[in-house]
């Protein structure tokens, strides 16, 4: 079983889409191994997105991610990283396939409803950024 990180971003939290998005993940076969709501500080958002620090959109991304609470989850399932990215859809909601989370709930390339890890390596780093081992309930093996 793989694990991946998913974040329901401030736009979706603010519009009360948490339950709908969680239901999509569960109906897609994911098990939620951990979940919590947090309101990121500037330092926390900058740390999480440090890989993008030199990109022109960095400050806008940080400002958006601190604009309201987010829901952070560890999703568990077979081929979790790839499946989560398929369920989320393209970064730009206008290019996302019909039925994906971003097509349903995203507004723009910057305000796009959810974040998901892009590799197993990054998933491990991102999960450790938000959760301690005691907070993650692994499936019985």
UniProtKB/Swiss-Prot annotation:
Enzyme Commission designation: 2.7.4.6
Organism superkingdom: Bacteria
Record: residues binding ATP: 9, 57, 85, 91, 102, 112
PANTHER family the record matches: NUCLEOSIDE DIPHOSPHATE KINASE (PTHR11349)
Upper lineage: Bacteria, Pseudomonadati, Chlamydiota, Chlamydiia, Chlamydiales
SMART domains according to UniProt: NDK (SM00562)
GO cellular component, one term: cytoplasm
InterPro entries documented for this protein: NDK-like_dom (IPR034907), NDK-like_dom_sf (IPR036850), Nucleoside_diP_kinase (IPR001564), Nucleoside_diP_kinase_AS (IPR023005)
Subunit structure: Homotetramer.
PROSITE patterns per record: NDPK, NDPK_LIKE
Organism this protein belongs to: Chlamydia caviae (strain ATCC VR-813 / DSM 19441 / 03DC25 / GPIC) (Chlamydophila caviae)
Chief location of this protein within or outside the cell: cytoplasm
Cofactor: Mg(2+)
Keywords: ATP-binding, Cytoplasm, Kinase, Magnesium, Metal-binding, Nucleotide metabolism, Nucleotide-binding, Phosphoprotein, Transferase
Function: Major role in the synthesis of nucleoside triphosphates other than ATP. The ATP gamma phosphate is transferred to the NDP beta phosphate via a ping-pong mechanism, using a phosphorylated active-site intermediate.
Protein name: Nucleoside diphosphate kinase
NCBIfam families the record matches: PRK00668.1 (NF001908)
Residues of the active site: 115
Known catalytic reactions: a 2'-deoxyribonucleoside 5'-diphosphate + ATP = a 2'-deoxyribonucleoside 5'-triphosphate + ADP; a ribonucleoside 5'-diphosphate + ATP = a ribonucleoside 5'-triphosphate + ADP
GO biological process: CTP biosynthetic process; GTP biosynthetic process; UTP biosynthetic process
Intracellular or extracellular location(s): Cytoplasm
Protein family according to the UniProt entry: Belongs to the NDK family.
GO terms of molecular function: ATP binding; metal ion binding; nucleoside diphosphate kinase activity
